[in-house]
Amino acid sequence: MIAYIEGRVAEVTEQSCVVVTQGGVGYEVHLPSHLLARLPEQGAAVSFYIHTVVREDALELYGFSGWDERQTFLVLISISKVGAKTALAVLSLYRPDDLRRIVADDDVTALTRVSGIGKKSAQHILLELKYKLKVESLPASAGLAAGVPGSVLRDAVQALGNLGYAEEEAAPVLKNILKQDPDLDVSEALRAALKALAKAR
């Protein structure tokens, strides 16, 4: 399962871009509009956190600027009748912190501004998010809010565990990274750890 990708921009469409990795393989990555709008020129380096959607007739990659945004996407697609395209439309209009405020304010109208979401669907999504966002307690947000290295370490180890890395493998790498740069947030620490772990393997 692809969870992170680095490469160079080969092509850009209205909803996606093609990222060519160092090995010469090109992947089409669907992106929220805020990422598409600030993509660099062709040939420039990019990196995204990825969620892979496997269907009977296709394998689709969805890319995000950080771990928090990726986790928010997963929460959204766990809601009944919310598919990947709708979840991406939500994140094209609202960032994760915006979405949390919408849930806290019980703002149904804000969700109806998303293309394809009517009032009834917005009410259903909001109800589900009240439960799911609280239960999930999205890790990157907690790390950023706390600003505590210990919290960053804990949340990054948990995120790597979700990607299949054992704690005894991930924790020493992260401790070393955070020792060198204690000001890193969860997303930055996770990115550095993934690079280090990939080299080690």
Curated annotation (Swiss-Prot):
Keywords: Cytoplasm, DNA damage, DNA recombination, DNA repair, DNA-binding. Residues 1-65 are annotated as: Domain I. InterPro entries: DNA_helicase_Holl-junc_RuvA_I, NA-bd_OB-fold, RuvA, RuvA_2-like, RuvA_C, RuvA_C_sf. GO terms for biological process: DNA recombination; DNA repair. Transmembrane segments: none annotated. Residues 66-143 are annotated as: Domain II. It is found in: Cytoplasm. GO terms for cellular component: cytoplasm; Holliday junction helicase complex; Holliday junction resolvase complex. Residues 148-201 are annotated as: Domain III. GO terms for molecular function: ATP binding; four-way junction DNA binding; four-way junction helicase activity. SUPFAM superfamilies: DNA helicase RuvA subunit, C-terminal domain, Nucleic acid-binding proteins, RuvA domain 2-like. Residues 143-147 are annotated as: Flexible linker. Gene3D superfamilies: 5' to 3' exonuclease, C-terminal subdomain, DNA helicase RuvA subunit, C-terminal domain, Nucleic acid-binding proteins. Homotetramer. Forms an RuvA(8)-RuvB(12)-Holliday junction (HJ) complex. HJ DNA is sandwiched between 2 RuvA tetramers; dsDNA enters through RuvA and exits via RuvB. An RuvB hexamer assembles on each DNA strand where it exits the tetramer. Each RuvB hexamer is contacted by two RuvA subunits (via domain III) on 2 adjacent RuvB subunits; this complex drives branch migration. In the full resolvosome a probable DNA-RuvA(4)-RuvB(12)-RuvC(2) complex forms which resolves the HJ. NCBIfam families: ruvA. Belongs to the RuvA family. The RuvA-RuvB-RuvC complex processes Holliday junction (HJ) DNA during genetic recombination and DNA repair, while the RuvA-RuvB complex plays an important role in the rescue of blocked DNA replication forks via replication fork reversal (RFR). RuvA specifically binds to HJ cruciform DNA, conferring on it an open structure. The RuvB hexamer acts as an ATP-dependent pump, pulling dsDNA into and through the RuvAB complex. HJ branch migration allows RuvC to scan DNA until it finds its consensus sequence, where it cleaves and resolves the cruciform DNA. Has three domains with a flexible linker between the domains II and III and assumes an 'L' shape. Domain III is highly mobile and contacts RuvB. This is Holliday junction branch migration complex subunit RuvA. The gene is ruvA.
